[in-house]
Amino acid sequence: MTAALRDAIGVEHPRVDAAQECRIVSLVPSVTELICALGLAPALVGRTGFCIHPRLTLEPIPKIGGTKDVNIDKIRQLAPTHLLVNIDENEKPTVDTLSRFVPNVIVTHPVAPEDNLSLYRLLGGIFGKEAEAESLCARFGEALSSLQQSQPLRKKAGPHRVLYCIWQDPWMTVSRDTYIARMLALIGWEQWISASEARYPVFRWDEPLLDNIDEILLSSEPYRFTEAHAEALERQLGKPVRLVDGEMVSWYGSRAIEGLAYLRTLSLS
């Protein structure tokens, strides 16, 4: 018996018939890239302005706003059969409105690196790209194994305590219950714990915080931190500050395979 294809909120999705014409709109940048990696770019009819990879493939695809402020009327005009969304990245009221006229709304929510495997298989299964999905799974497994084999010395040395910053004015970070924190944990980097229960808490710089971290990480997205920000903050706080590629750490989907290799480089630098 073929396994049911259930998304992140438990909704079961039918497999697309080979003769059925799919029209996909993606509101999730990393999932848009994954759709293309699965060979489904010809079915993609709409994307957000933040869906930028692969660049040449996506240039002719219509933009329908941002991840938080989509143009509902434009999506309606595109008449999608499938909508790809994410619990963290898209607004639920917007998704609820879109679900009234889009037949299939596929909800994603990877919270750990290994969740990429089920994501590949979910989308590959729905759209008849099982072979492509399994190829991605194999590549992910190889990259994860290579990363794990490079880490025994790091594990013996104990965790490296970090604060991963995603925004300033106000300063914001991530909780340990996030994909980002669990990616960092693969190389023994332990994300700072906030007193807040929010997944993306606001924080203030103070001595207790600084006493409990070894290094500050500034992500290149969603806030566009630069080396200039890193240098200024290091002078101000007297703690090591490093700029990291946010796409490599936070993008799940096919980008996660490159992300694992990037983590290996980070851990050895």
Model segments located where?
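N-terminal ligand-binding lobe of clamshell/alpha-beta domains
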Residues: 1-269
